[in-house]
């Protein structure tokens, strides 16, 4: 009985790093979809790229390229230790076409990582790392 209670309790305790990374992934998915919608509606070529931290102390972040200046989307992670890597290319292409290439971005925070992706038609979402 005690073993079952301990097992259930350990499953209920989430790793705080995993939770932070999951929040970053959900936030990034929403930002990517917002930029994708703007790209389609305005006929703009919009790209997203991760920006590494630099030697001057600027934290890692990301940049949307091609959006109108009045549309100010965030450029920093909520957790400054987050790192991102676009898989197979330097940037994500978010428009102007409704059907974009299948794309993925790997997010890392400490030892945790999550893969965010789209098949080109569906919205960006967390996908299993074993998915093609």
Residue ranges of model-derived segments:
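N-terminal helix-rich module
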Residues: 4-41, 45, 50-132
């Amino acid at each position: 009985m005690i073993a079952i209670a301990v097992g259930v309790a350990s499953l209920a305790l989430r790793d705080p790093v995993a939770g932070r990374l999951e929040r970053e992934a959900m936030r990034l998915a929403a930002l990517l979809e917002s930029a994708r919608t703007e790209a389609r509606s305005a006929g703009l070529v919009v790209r997203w790229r991760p920006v590494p931290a630099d030697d001057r102390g600027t934290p890692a972040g990301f940049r949307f390229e091609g959006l109108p200046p009045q549309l100010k989307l965030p450029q920093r992670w909520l957790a400054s230790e987050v790192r991102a890597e676009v898989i197979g290319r330097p940037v994500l292409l978010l428009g102007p076409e409704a059907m974009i290439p299948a794309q993925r971005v790997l997010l890392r925070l400490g030892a945790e990582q999550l893969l965010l992706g789209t098949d080109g038609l569906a919205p960006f979402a967390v996908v299993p790392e074993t998915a093609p």
